[in-house]
Swiss-Prot record:
Family the entry assigns: Belongs to the orthopoxvirus OPG128 family.
Organism listed in the record: Variola virus (isolate Human/India/Ind3/1967)
Disulfide topology: C17-C21
Subunit structure and binding partners: Interacts with sulfhydryl oxidase OPG072; this interaction involves formation of a transient disulfide-bonded intermediate, allowing disulfide bond transfer. Interacts with OPG088; this interaction involves formation of a transient disulfide-bonded intermediate, allowing disulfide bond transfer.
Expression triggers: Expressed in the late phase of the viral replicative cycle.
Protein role: Late protein which probably participates in disulfide bond formation by functioning as a thiol-disulfide transfer protein between membrane-associated OPG072 and OPG08. The complete pathway for formation of disulfide bonds in intracellular virion membrane proteins sequentially involves oxidation of OPG072, OPG128 and OPG08.
Lineage, highest ranks first: Viruses, Varidnaviria, Bamfordvirae, Nucleocytoviricota, Pokkesviricetes
Protein name according to UniProt: Protein OPG128
Matches recorded under InterPro entries: Poxvirus_A2.5L (IPR007952)
A Pfam family this chain is assigned to: Pox_A3L
Highest rank taxon of the organism: Viruses
Amino acid sequence: MSWYEKYNIVLNPPKRCFSSCADNLTTILAEDGNNIRAILYSQPQKLKVLQDFLATSRNKMFLYKILDDEIRRVLT
């Protein structure tokens, strides 16, 4: 018997993000640019995945206004 078999974890299903959740996300993106920049630069593989995703899914609905200027520079 492995040590982890005695643990039982029950996760609640994910909740849908409503407008207040989206507002919180945009506030974090706008206010914490230095931390986000450091995270992006420290994880080049994730940055590449994000760049590829944005390049393939870019459309007129995506708002770059919510992104910090430095993140926008890195992603484009």
